[in-house]
């Protein structure tokens, strides 16, 4: 029976999703390099003698283990074990496999010629055949997502597997890690686990480079916990470096309270807070083609984040106990941790928090300046480096923890060095002035005091959201520990009630003692 217009449209959409996600078959498998234009032959046990390809293009036999196959001498390569069919199909001119095999099905959906190894006959791979095959995929099984057990359509299953493939591709090739704090190692292990297992932890930088060199693998580092010269040593040794940092939607609680991250970024080119060199995020924002489907996700994600009052450390946060003067512009000035890497590298104008306050006051001498110290500073665990003689520049200093989202609803403008609060303000439609060079500056969305000449593209807010929240970070579902989408983590964070452990409570108490011994802005 011919497919209806609706069925054809849905079949075309499924094929398009599969191509984009590159899932199906053992997509997590190995990726050997083959001769371009070759034939891959995947016999089924007992079928091998039913078809023997003729000599011509190079032929690679793909089997579970070394077989006794009656092939007649045209086999330059033997492929064994789990392999990524998408990588294989990028290189082939033809596939020989049983008609119901994943390799054959994917090849036909891609329009690659397939010969049924059982019958020896070619299988149709024209548009009509591809649509019919896609419709069979749509109708056949029932799919359930692993987070709630609820039934989902095949398209959603493809999207979910696409997230898992992106996760595996991001951490692929990492063989050793160094600089991960002990309390977060188990969580980082979950993030970095790939096809080859968990990358081992090295005790020294020398050991990390030796292991990576032996394995011909990359080393994952936490940049602030390795010597500055480490990357130069790695480059001299030919060892790739993957830099790991917290993601932009981190967790329902602070890292200084030992709450493990539910999101990280893994950057092979640089790091998002260092404007002196490109990063994977900067390249993505500069070059990626953002398809309409992705931008629709970005719009929905942004609206959910804003409506739930979410930020880097989850939801909630009490509104500040302050009434802003109605006859003055209100400017929120965001403080940061003085020795944070993003400040040390991105505060191009210099001066730290004090310089930020001075410039904000010079920019708006008649405005009401509200200064918000960083949560880690208010917790008592980190320092702000704000000189006491600059306190008078602010009309009010928020010396008690309060939510950022409620503040962003009532202020007229936000001034930052490199703080992620500037990005959160953009999500909520605020005017943002960047005194440093954070990842979201230089794309035409902020008022910038410094420039990053590499950033020439003009982005929409939703393109920025798509790159920074949907494509750059990795996420783990807090309930199952499985890789998940940004939308899944946002749903979890929106409904999360922080349940501090004994260790978390002890860290909170320790911070209160430290805070009692010094001003929150010190």
Can you annotate each of these PLM segments?
Residues 1-522:
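Catalytic-core helical/loop segments in enzymes performing group transfer/polymerization on anionic/lipid-linked
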């Amino acid at each position: 029976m011919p497919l209806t217009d609706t069925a054809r449209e849905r079949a075309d959409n499924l094929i398009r999703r599969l191509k984009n996600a590159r899932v199906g078959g053992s997509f997590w498998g190995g990726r050997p390099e083959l001769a371009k234009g070759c034939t891959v032959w995947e016999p089924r046990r007992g079928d091998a003698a039913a078809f023997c390809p003729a000599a011509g293009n190079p032929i690679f036999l793909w089997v579970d283990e070394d077989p006794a196959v009656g092939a007649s001498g045209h086999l330059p390569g033997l492929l064994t074990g789990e392999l990524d069919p998408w990588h294989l199909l990028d290189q082939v001119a033809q596939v020989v496999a049983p008609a119901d095999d994943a390799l054959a099905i994917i090849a036909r959906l891609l329009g690659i010629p397939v010969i049924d190894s059982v019958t020896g006959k070619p299988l149709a791979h024209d548009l009509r055949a591809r649509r019919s095959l896609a419709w069979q995929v749509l109708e056949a099984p029932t799919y359930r997502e692993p987070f709630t057990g609820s039934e989902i359509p095949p398209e959603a299953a493809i999207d979910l597997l696409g997230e898992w493939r992106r996760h595996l591709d991001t951490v692929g090739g990492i063989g050793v890690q160094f600089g991960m704090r002990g309390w977060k190692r188990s969580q980082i292990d979950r993030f970095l686990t790939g096809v080859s297992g968990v990358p081992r932890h090295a005790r020294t930088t020398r050991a990390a480079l030796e292991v990576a060199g032996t394995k011909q693998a990359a080393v994952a580092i936490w940049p602030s916990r390795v010597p500055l010269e480490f990357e130069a040593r790695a480059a001299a040794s030919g060892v790739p470096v993957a830099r790991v940092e917290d993601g932009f939607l981190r967790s329902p609680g602070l890292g200084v309270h030992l709450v493990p991250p539910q999101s990280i970024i893994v950057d092979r080119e640089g790091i998002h807070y260092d404007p002196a060199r490109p990063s994977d995020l900067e390249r993505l924002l500069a070059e990626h083609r953002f398809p309409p489907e992705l931008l629709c996700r970005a719009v929905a994600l942004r609206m959910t984040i804003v409506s739930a009052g979410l930020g880097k450390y989850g939801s909630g946060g009490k509104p500040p106990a302050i009434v802003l003067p109605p006859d003055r512009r209100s400017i929120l000035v965001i403080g940061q941790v003085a020795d944070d890497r993003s400040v040390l590298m991105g505060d191009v104008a210099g001066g730290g928090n004090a310089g930020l306050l001075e410039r904000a006051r010079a920019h708006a001498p008649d405005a009401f300046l509200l200064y918000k110290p960083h949560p880690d500073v208010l917790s008592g665990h980190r320092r702000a480096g704000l000189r006491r003689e600059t306190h008078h520049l602010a009309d009010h200093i928020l010396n008690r923890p309060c939510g950022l989202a409620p503040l962003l609803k009532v202020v007229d403008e936000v001034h930052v060095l490199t703080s992620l609060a500037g990005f959160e303000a953009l999500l909520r439609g605020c005017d943002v002035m960047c005194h440093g060079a954070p990842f979201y500056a230089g794309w035409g969305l902020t008022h910038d005091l410094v420039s990053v000449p590499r950033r020439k593209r003009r982005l929409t807010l939703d393109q920025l959201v798509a790159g920074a929240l949907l494509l750059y970070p990795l996420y783990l579902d807090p309930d199952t520990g499985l890789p998940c989408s940004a939308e899944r983590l946002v749903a979890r964070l929106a409904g999360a009630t922080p349940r501090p452990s004994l260790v978390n409570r002890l860290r909170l108490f320790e911070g209160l003692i430290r805070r009692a011994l010094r001003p929150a802005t010190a």
